[in-house]
Amino acid sequence: MNVLIIGSGGREHALGWKAAQNPNVETIFVAPGNAGTALEPKLENVNIAVEDIAGLVAFAKEKAIELTIVGPEVPLVLGVVDAFYEAGLPIFGPTQAAAQLEGSKAFTKDFLARHQIPTAAYANFTDIEPALAYVREQGAPIVVKADGLAAGKGVIVAMTLEEAEEAIKDMLAGNAFGEAGSRVVIEEFLDGEEASFIVMVDGENVLPMATSQDHKRVGDKDTGPNTGGMGAYSPAPVVTPEIHNRVMQEVIFPTVRGMAAEGNPYTGFLYAGLMIDKDGTPKVIEYNCRFGDPETQPIMMRMESDLVELCLAAIDKKLDQVESKWDPRASIGIVLAAGGYPAAYNKGDVISGLPQVEIEGEKVFHAGTENKEGDIVTNGGRVLCATALGNSVSEAQQRAYELAKQIRWEGMFHRNDIGYRAIAREQQK
């Protein structure tokens, strides 16, 4: 069978690498892919942009694609799933209406309130003055979010009133995030530990993936601006079996039931970004309608089930008949980024030291890379993700940093403490 994966990041490289392990899969086309997917056995890049919905549909028809997996959020919010359904093509992802869970933060907060799903107290604004008045009344720290898609960067955690006021003015008047910021959500600052809780949904049944924890801030010890994610590990020890159960009962099931009841049944990967407070109460910070990046990379390293079979079962509404199996080892992925990221950065720098031979339990997933005249060069802010398995998070971390150490380009940087919370827990034991 032929498979299509939409996207060009580290997440799509990891999904493609995992899907290629299915013996019935002949070719996995990645649109548009990157330099890493181009080199992967069974994978083939196709020069179609993720926003080119008509082009993707035409290609899937031409190649008789039997499964399409959508990586990023943009095509989902543009309605790629609806277009594939109309053409009678099998695709795993939420419809345009269901993808509002990620596409609009205001929609999501109102949905959570309607279904009594735990989240931070909030208010939505389109005008500056009422927004400023609300912030002054609430005080800092407080969180200001652009309503629409902003590539993971439209969230400002304001520690002072000045920062909050500046963020509101930037978004509502300065148009810092364009259309995405024409409405803002202001919400209470939640204290606790974050976790990424990702599940597969077929409309009603839910299959949990392994838990993970992302590191959003650009700098060590969680300093500096938010990014799309600087590294992740799986499993996340903060999600104990009791908390896992609470998340399923209090967050995931009510979300899936609520979407179905409102006429937007949800199919696809559903990612709940959670804050878990000291009492173990999970609250929803955000939803994503897709697998996280970089969480996909360590999670796929641990997945022992067949990803293609799971996606096909979900499309057939048979997720209750399959199970997911996981490597008991921990996995960690460290993002290697271009100097300047998440602000302006260089492209086109030649990357050296990429591993020529793959070692079991180690993998460099490509994100912002391209092939230029035989050289692999940088082509994005997050360039690579050095990923490794280990018997503990400490061991996985050591292996991943060893792997990262061999790779070089002008201006490359990474965080040096990915996994620090889990390692602190391991040391306490």
Swiss-Prot record:
This is Phosphoribosylamine--glycine ligase. HAMAP family: GARS. Its cofactor is Mg(2+); Mn(2+). ATP binds at residues 135-196. Pfam families: GARS_A, GARS_C, GARS_N. Mg(2+) binds at residues 286, 288. Keywords: ATP-binding, Ligase, Magnesium, Manganese, Metal-binding, Nucleotide-binding, Purine biosynthesis. It comes from Vibrio vulnificus (strain CMCP6). It catalyses: 5-phospho-beta-D-ribosylamine + glycine + ATP = N(1)-(5-phospho-beta-D-ribosyl)glycinamide + ADP + phosphate + H(+). Belongs to the GARS family. The gene is purD. It is an enzyme of class 6 (ligase). InterPro entries: ATP-grasp (IPR011761), ATP_grasp_subdomain_1 (IPR013815), PreATP-grasp_dom_sf (IPR016185), PRibGlycinamid_synth_ATP-grasp (IPR020561), PRibGlycinamide_synth (IPR000115), PRibGlycinamide_synth_C-dom (IPR020560), PRibGlycinamide_synth_C_sf (IPR037123), PRibGlycinamide_synth_CS (IPR020559). Residues 213-223 have a biased composition (Basic and acidic residues). Binds 1 Mg(2+) or Mn(2+) ion per subunit. Its EC number is 6.3.4.13. One of its GO terms (molecular function) is metal ion binding. PROSITE patterns: ATP_GRASP, GARS. Residues 109-316 form the ATP-grasp domain. Pathway: Purine metabolism; IMP biosynthesis via de novo pathway; N(1)-(5-phospho-D-ribosyl)glycinamide from 5-phospho-alpha-D-ribose 1-diphosphate: step 2/2. Residues 212-234 are annotated as: Disordered. PANTHER family: PHOSPHORIBOSYLAMINE--GLYCINE LIGASE (PTHR43472), PHOSPHORIBOSYLAMINE--GLYCINE LIGASE, CHLOROPLASTIC (PTHR43472:SF1). GO terms for biological process: 'de novo' IMP biosynthetic process; purine nucleobase biosynthetic process. The lineage of its organism: Bacteria, Pseudomonadati, Pseudomonadota, Gammaproteobacteria, Vibrionales.
